[in-house]
Amino acid sequence: MAELEQLLDESSSAKALVSLREGSLSNTLNEKNNLPKSQTTRGRSSYVSMETPTRSSKRSRLSCEDEERPIASRSPRRSQRVTTMPQKLTNVATPDKRVSQKIGLRLRNLLKLPKAHKWCIYEWFYSNIDRPLFEGDNDFCLCLKESFPNLKTRKLTRVEWGTIRRLMGKPRRCSSAFFAEERMALKQKRQKMRLLQQRKITDMSLCKDLPDEIPLPLVIGTKVTARLRGVHDGLFTGQIDAVDTSAATYRVTFDRNGLGTHTVPDYEVLSNEPHETMPISAFAQKQRPPRFQNFLTPPRGSYTGSTQSILMDNDPLFSQSPWRSKLTGTDGETLGGFPVKFLVQVTRLSKILMIKKEHIKHLKEMNTEAEKLKSYSMPIGLDLQKRYATTVLDLEQLNKDLNKVLHEVQQFCFELAPDQGMQPADQPSELRRRCEEESQDVLRQNNTLASGEPRVQNTELTQLISRLTALLLQIRCLAEGGDLNSFEFKSLTDSLNDIKSSIDDSNLSCFQDNVEIHVAHIQSGLSQLGNLHAFSANNTNRT
């Protein structure tokens, strides 16, 4: 029995030696520990069997020298690397959910700190007007382009970069004069971009320091993220309600309850939608030709209103006010340095805009309710349809009243124009007349054959071609102009309606699909009023 135990110990020690060479000693020891207990005995023999692998290692190494040579040439480290690398990759690919939640909680707590929150704003929040300025080439890249125009690569060695920096000189940084100079340069660039957006720069040589792409101004109704200062310091989402180009600000109504409406500078407003840009070269081509510079202004002629607006006459507060007798005085009366009739029109304009804003709010709520019913596959009730139709009709009447009041306000503004040094301007109808004359000249030149006979002899067709050509010339003049207003669009709409009325009923659908819809898109693109160009012209003519 003792001899059998000795043979088992020697065989196990030999296996342990081979497994040690192959890097799997732990597996061999596990196999040895899993032997049946019936083969082990108590006392000294079991202790000897545990010590035999260390005693017999030298003898087994000498006896098995031929088998050990190929084993010694193998590298156990390499085999371990190959086997463990996939396990590490699988662990990285599937992170622990608890660890991720813990990191997210710590990050959220960090961003609650005022300094960390401001640091994130300064680092990543760029407004539409600042994004091309800060995300473009930095000062070092600009200096490289000016100092080394022939340098086409940016992959240089450290020695070559050191030589370039030595030639350029040491920059002056982190001084009060440097920061003041940078702030002034940024302020000037912002002002140049605003003037470009308003088409008020004629000399494009002043815009050499601006980026190649200039962002377009935001329009009313755009979803934005704006920064508030003061009590509510931070970034909040909202919607643009008004645009003030003179002060370079936006009137933003915020989504969060309690914030209300605030005036925010344009350099602290970021659009949530992808911002549109225009090449700076396109602004140079948008300058108005001298022959059209006096055409695109509202008329100075007197406006004969048919009826007075019911918004002021039937107002119980205004009818009982002691100021009513003063506000209905003669033409020469003034109040606070302004004509009385002008103040009346401004008050009417303010009330119409306030009422229209409430109607648009109700219309938005009804749209939300209708979309909710549609998502639930529920029918839209008759009461909702009636309220919706009533609101739409009220908005149409408000647009008509608003157009009349705008005519009156524009009339008073241009009566005050000579005192402010403004030059008198022609009516938009003059622009329309000039375009019609030019279209007739173009048609006369291109409709004549070499023999002197006309190409198109039908009079109705020649008139239609002339009117459509005049419409295109009118659109070109509006596109090349500067600031646009409702009177210019009204003249364009009047020309379109005249052409539409002269067409046969069988061709109206073709005219609407191929001409009218494209002109409407052009009007929407030219106007900076966005979706509010509905009341810029009288679009109530329907067939």
From Swiss-Prot:
SMART domains hit by this protein: DIRP
Annotated spans, Disordered: 21-82
Coiled coil spans: 355-451
Keyword terms of this UniProt record: Coiled coil, Nucleus
Membrane-spanning segments: none
Domain of life: Eukaryota
A single GO BP: regulation of transcription by RNA polymerase II
Compartments in which it is found: Nucleus
Gene Ontology CC annotations of this record: nucleoplasm; transcription repressor complex
Main localization of the protein described in the UniProt heading: nucleus
Bias-annotated ranges (Polar residues): 24-55
Any one GO molecular function term: DNA binding
Keyword Nucleus: yes
Subunit organization: Component of the DREAM complex.
Family: Belongs to the lin-9 family.
PANTHER family membership: LIN-9, PROTEIN LIN-9 HOMOLOG
UniProt name for this protein: Protein lin-9 homolog
